[in-house]
From Swiss-Prot:
UDP-N-acetyl-alpha-D-glucosamine binds at residues 92, 121-125, 307, 329. This is UDP-N-acetylglucosamine 1-carboxyvinyltransferase 2. It catalyses: phosphoenolpyruvate + UDP-N-acetyl-alpha-D-glucosamine = UDP-N-acetyl-3-O-(1-carboxyvinyl)-alpha-D-glucosamine + phosphate. One of its GO terms (biological process) is cell division. One of its GO terms (molecular function) is UDP-N-acetylglucosamine 1-carboxyvinyltransferase activity. It is an enzyme of class 2 (transferase).
Length: 426
């Protein structure tokens, strides 16, 4: 494992460019195996999840190259094979291979995926969707075996009991080549779902309604890539750096941003008193001084993203009063709380609420990044704190943030990644 070493306590300034969306990328890469031609993606983030997904592709004889932010994937000689468990178990989004393999081969075997430990994220809605499409699903030990009869998959009406990004994407992947029309009701509306649908439609798929709560998929026999697909900017990375800029910035410009995707987040910053300058594809954050406390409640898109409730926490510590965070999506997403307390933060969990008090002075400490977004919160806090902060399990941060060390260096941060001898590899 790796650790992040931060010499904090100084103001940062400059500009940086937001990378492609992680949550799009981890769906688009499995989707590529549905194509009958090579496919190409641009603005691909340099994150560990991409590396692990490429390992999974290689195990199926799907070759890929990754140069200058461009990822080329050639699925024309794909072979069914057992997917590498070490790569599957390291990232949650590997479950998208269930839908993609089902769409390609009418069968799939996938080990239960890993990823962040932030409480239960069941796949029952995925299974419900596959069964509605005509698949037989068997769960055994830590694996899922999915198969169809000789008729293959067929269109169906599927009502999701809960709004689920993962289930919406997996059903799209399975249904895009199925016979007939599939309707997903109570579908997730995230921009990453629109991005996936755009990619598939440009290859000949017939998907309507992405971005609304009703998505209709008319199955097609084949998909052929015609052009490079540019991945949308990462709204979670954007929000993380907005929080950093408002916390410890002395004027920071974020480029390659879609402001419409950030409205629930930027509205909260404005409510705090941050003087954002929002342009067509960039956001400038001047130095922020007196900040008001706020109440944050996570919701499905277009509400406040659960992935941003931890990264905004270091900013809430600067507010003149107590802020409250309610995570309705993953109430157990509180790993950052105890770690921030080690740095002197006035923060606690109380009756499923996170109460964040004014903390004028954070002190560097040894802390642990239990998952991606708690790691981002600790990173911002470490940059704000006086002294040295060491974040163990920093691989979790590298999993989700594109070239994070390089970007922090461009802002003037004193930060580095080093081997962590005390934490063994998984």
């Amino acid at each position: 494992m790796k650790k992040m070493i931060i010499h904090g306590g100084k103001r940062l300034s400059g500009e940086l460019t937001i990378g492609g969306a992680k949550n799009s990328t981890v769906a688009l890469i499995p989707a590529a195996i549905l194509a009958d031609t090579p496919v190409q993606f641009d603005t691909v983030p340099h994150i560990l999840d991409v590396h692990n997904l490429r390992l999974i592709l290689e195990s199926m004889n799907v070759h890929s190259t990754f140069e200058n932010d461009v990822l080329t994937i050639d699925p024309t000689n794909i072979e069914e094979s057992e997917l590498p468990s070490h790569a599957i178990k390291s990232l949650r989004a590997s479950y998208y291979f269930m839908g993609a393999l089902l769409g390609r081969f009418n069968r799939a075997t996938v080990t239960f995926p890993g990823g962040d430990n932030i409480g239960p994220r069941p796949i029952d809605q995925h299974i419900k969707g596959f069964k509605a499409l005509g698949a037989n699903v068997v769960e055994e030990n830590d694996s899922v075996f999915i198969s169809t009869g000789t008729e293959g998959l067929h269109g169906a009406r599927i009502f999701l009991d809960v709004v689920s990004v993962g289930a919406t994407i997996n059903i799209i992947l399975a249904a895009v080549k199925a016979h007939g029309t599939t309707t997903i009701e109570n579908a997730a509306k995230e921009p990453e779902i629109i991005d996936l649908a755009t990619f598939l439609n440009n290859m000949g798929a017939k998907i309507r309604g992405a971005g609304t709560d009703v998505i209709r998929i008319e199955g097609v026999p084949a998909l052929h890539s015609r052009a490079t697909h540019t991945i949308i900017p990462d709204r979670i990375e954007t929000g993380t750096y907005l929080s950093l800029a408002a916390s410890i910035g002395d004027g920071i410009l974020l480029k390659n941003v879609i402001p419409e995707h950030m409205e629930s987040f930027t509205a909260k910053l404005v409510e705090m008193g941050v003087d954002l300058q929002i342009n067509e594809d960039s956001i400038y954050v001047p130095r922020s001084n007196d900040l008001d406390p706020i109440r944050v409640k996570t919701m499905t898109y277009p509400g406040f993203a659960t992935d941003l409730q931890q990264p905004i926490t270091p900013l809430l510590l600067r507010a003149n009063g107590s802020s409250v965070v309610i995570d309705t999506i993953y109430p157990q997403r509180t790993q950052h709380v105890e770690q921030l307390r080690k740095m002197g933060a006035d923060i606690r969990v109380q009756d499923n609420l996170i109460v964040v008090g004014h903390s004028s002075h954070l002190q560097g400490a040894h802390v642990e990044a239990g998952e991606i977004r708690s790691g981002a919160a600790l990173m911002i806090a470490g940059l704000a704190a006086s002294g040295v902060t060491e974040i163990s399990r920093a691989d979790n941060i590298l999993r989700g943030y594109d070239r994070v060390i390089d970007k922090l260096h461009t802002l003037g941060a004193d930060v580095e990644i080093a081997a962590d001898e005390e934490v063994p590899e998984n």
